[in-house]
Every structure is written in structure tokens, then in C-alpha cells.
UniProtKB/Swiss-Prot annotation:
Name of protein: Nodulation protein D 2
Similarity-based family: Belongs to the LysR transcriptional regulatory family.
Highest taxon listed in the record's lineage: Bacteria
Keywords: Activator, DNA-binding, Nodulation, Plasmid, Repressor, Transcription, Transcription regulation
Family annotation (Gene3D superfamilies): Periplasmic binding protein-like II, Winged helix-like DNA-binding domain superfamily/Winged helix DNA-binding domain
Alphabetized Pfam families for the sequence: HTH_1, LysR_substrate
Keyword ATP-binding on entry: no
DNA-binding region: 23-42
Species, as recorded: Bradyrhizobium japonicum
Domain HTH lysR-type: 6-63
GO terms for MF: DNA binding; DNA-binding transcription factor activity
Length: 312
């Protein structure tokens, strides 16, 4: 099919090349042979009057022209895809749909286990690809690279729909042998003690607790940085270090790991975890169904207490 002299199939090839940055991988992703993909590149170059890609080792490096074209091409293809899919009837019992979801280790442990267990009973053909939050959520949603992103609402993209899932709050935790946690922490003690902190992604972006602490003037002396909250409890054992963690995750680990829990020197407001999806998925029947499942399971979650009960 052609539009103003352009074979629209070439846009599919261009999108695959921008995504995979490899001729072989791009060809495989859209079921083309490598020679056919090479021919598509030649035709794209002729039509746009630009090289579009150069080789650096085995990687394709897009030119500024290709980078400028990529968002419009992806948006056009997604509009076509979801305009067609949205009209298909979705039967979760028979579906083999695989949902691609970006989420934190906190949500994985305290919430998503419920979802997986429920669907194993009600929709056993449904699968998941659960991936860490490592990239900019706005970019992930814009390019339709995920079905859902679950993240603190403070970090949610303003360009895509969202729904609140659950509330959480931050507490201070340490080893049961940490004597400084036997009393209410002062600002001075909290700031002077060694901390373990979580940061995320390739660039180690600050997590929700770092944002809230700085927003309210609480500073820490960070001695250890880990790529997720779930790695913190084992590293507290046998040390005088402390950490600031979401209470729901602390409650999860407290079942198996000895922890001393204390209130922060300043009560911080609760924060919400939200689910987002690409705006183009709004009418996709499978996406609508999964949103309902997520929201239903979130309603069954208990509300975290307003204050922390001291644990010796």
C-alpha cells in the first residue's frame, strides 16, 4: 500500500530499526529476511533523501532525520494497531495475551503476587513480562513499549491516563540490635547515622523516599546504595545502619526478617502508588480488563497505619 509515493510497509521497517538498532534483530522482529530489510533501508533512504542510519560496530546509529521521524512513525503505527484491536472482543479465559509491565520491587512483592495468583485461577493463559523501572516512564508510555507502568504517583507522566492503586508511608528500620532505635529518633541522630538507600535505573535515579525526605528537609549520611528496596533488610543485619523504607514492604519482610521499626523524626505525608497506561490503549479491551483487575486487587489491600507501632 502506498501513500504519496511511500510504501507504508517501510514505516514498519523504520520503526523496527529504530527500536532494535540492528538490521538482523529488526528483520527478525517483523518476520523479514535480512536481505529484505537491507532493501527496505535502501528504499527508505531514497524516499527521505537521507542516510537515516550509519553503522558503529554492529549497532545502527540513527541520523537526526531518523530521530525526528521516529515519534511520528511510532504514533501512526500505534494508532492503526489499537484502532483495530480495540474492536476485538476480549475473552480473558481463552486469551494468551502477555502483558508487559514496568514496576518496582516494592510493588512486585507487596501487591503483584495477588494479581498473578488470581489470574492463574481465572485466566491461566494470561502471561506477564514484569520489568524493573529503569527508564523514563513518559518515554516508555509514549512509544507503547509497555502495557502498564506502576510507580509512585509523584513520578507519573502528565501525558497519559492513570489510576491510584494504594497508599503507603515511610518508616525508619534497622537491625534489632541497633540501640539508637530504642528511642524516638531526633533530627540530629537521623542525620548522623549511616544509611542504606535505594536508587534505580542505569543512572541511579533517587527513589520516592529520597524525594520526600529532601522535600521536607531531612538529610542523610548515605553509606550504601542498592538498586532496590528489597535488598536493604539483609544488609541492615548486624549493623548500626538504618534505612527509610515503605511501610508495606517493611511489613512484608517483618514476617521473615528481624527488623526494628521506628518513626521518622518528622512525620511525612503518605504517598500513592499509581498505574499508568499509554493513552492509545484507552479503548483496548484487554487493557481495560487488566485495569479492572488491578484496581479490584488494590481495594483488597489493607490500609497502612497512620503511625508506627514500636517494635523492640
Amino acid at each position: 500500500m502506498r501513500f504519496k509515493g511511500l510504501d507504508l510497509n517501510l514505516l514498519v521497517a523504520l520503526d523496527a530499526l529504530m527500536t532494535k538498532r540492528s538490521v538482523t534483530a529488526a528483520a527478525r522482529s517483523i518476520n523479514l529476511s535480512q536481505p529484505a530489510m537491507s532493501a527496505a533501508i535502501a528504499r527508505l533512504r531514497t524516499y527521505f533523501g537521507d542516510d537515516l542510519f550509519t553503522m558503529r560496530g554492529r549497532e545502527l546509529i540513527p541520523t537526526p532525520r531518523a530521530i525526528a521521524l521516529a515519534p511520528a512513525v511510532r504514533d501512526a503505527l500505534l494508532h492503526i494497531q489499537f484502532s483495530i484491536i480495540s474492536w476485538d472482543m476480549f475473552n480473558p479465559v481463552q486469551s494468551q495475551r502477555r502483558f508487559r509491565i514496568r514496576l518496582s520491587d516494592v510493588i512486585m512483592l507487596v501487591f503483584f503476587e495477588r494479581v498473578v495468583k488470581r489470574l492463574a485461577r481465572e485466566a491461566p493463559g494470561i502471561g506477564f513480562e514484569l520489568l524493573p523501572l529503569t527508564e523514563d516512564p513518559d518515554e516508555l508510555l509514549r512509544y507503547g513499549d509497555v502495557d502498564f507502568v506502576i510507580l509512585p504517583e509523584l513520578f507519573a507522566s502528565s501525558d497519559h491516563p492513570k489510576a491510584k492503586l494504594l497508599d503507603d508511608t515511610l518508616v525508619c528500620v534497622g537491625c534489632p540490635t541497633n540501640k539508637q532505635l530504642k528511642r524516638q529518633l531526633s533530627f540530629e541522630n537521623y542525620g548522623s547515622m549511616g544509611h542504606i538507600a535505594a536508587k534505580f535505573g542505569r543512572t541511579l535515579k533517587p527513589s520516592i523516599e529520597n524525594w520526600l525526605l529532601l522535600e521536607h528537609g531531612l538529610k542523610r549520611r548515605i553509606e550504601v546504595v542498592v538498586p532496590g528496596f528489597s535488598l536493604i533488610p539483609p544488609l541492615l543485619s548486624g549493623t548500626d545502619r538504618i534505612a527509610t523504607m515503605p511501610l508495606r514492604l517493611v511489613e512484608h519482610f517483618a514476617k521473615t526478617t528481624p527488623l526494628r521499626v521506628a518513626e521518622l523524626p518528622l512525620a511525612l505525608p503518605p504517598f500513592a502508588q499509581a498505574v499508568q497506561w499509554p493513552s492509545l490503549h484507552n479503548r483496548d479491551q484487554a487493557s481495560i480488563w487488566m485495569r479492572q483487575v488491578l484496581l479490584q486487587e488494590a481495594l483488597h489491600m489493607t490500609t497502612p497505619p497512620d503511625s508506627v507501632e514500636y517494635r523492640p
